[in-house]
């Protein structure tokens, strides 16, 4: 925003996967949001989104910060503009804006949870591998792909599948 003269609309880019180690991390996006809102000559903020989503935690941090900044700067409107894709966590972020715009061909939405893994129990037995895993502490071998899935692991993922989308809906 350096060198911007006169009233203008600030632009914050959200491109690619939303994750702590990506360009679209909460730290990077939040820093850009703060600069955009704090700039005295910015009259509004555009979130230009092209992201398939990613970490619900990172997206939640950004969502919360947009809400906080909107309260602190109520005169500055936030507009989410989705280009090719604004799915999952990216749509969650867009939901914090005053208005959302997208092209009729944009992919928008896809709120939910995907979690996958593999179970190798039969393969291990078939090729004669005897795996030894030594742990201390509860849940240290949680989601280990080699033994049969425990009932608690399935119940855990069921709770994640139910609770994470609910966060999107209630915020």
Whereabouts are the PLM-identified features?
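Small-residue-centered hinge/linker elements
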Residues: 1-76, 85-171
């Amino acid at each position: 925003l350096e060198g911007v003269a006169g009233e203008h609309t600030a632009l914050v880019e959200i491109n690619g996967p939303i994750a702590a180690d990506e360009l679209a991390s909460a730290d990077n996006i939040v820093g850009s949001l703060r600069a955009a809102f704090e700039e005295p000559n910015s009259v509004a903020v555009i979130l230009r989104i092209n992201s398939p989503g990613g970490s619900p935690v990172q997206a939640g941090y950004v969502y919360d910060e947009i809400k906080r900044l909107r309260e602190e700067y109520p005169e500055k409107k936030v507009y989410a503009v989705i280009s090719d894709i604004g799915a999952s966590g990216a749509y969650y972020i867009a939901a914090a804006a005053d208005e959302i715009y997208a092209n009729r061909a944009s992919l928008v939405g896809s709120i939910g949870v995907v979690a996958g893994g593999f179970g190798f129990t039969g393969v291990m037995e078939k090729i004669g591998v005897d795996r030894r895993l030594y742990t201390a502490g509860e849940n240290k071998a949680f989601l280990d792909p080699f033994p049969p899935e425990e009932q608690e692991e399935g119940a855990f993922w069921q709770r994640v599948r139910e609770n994470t989308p609910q966060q999107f809906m209630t915020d």
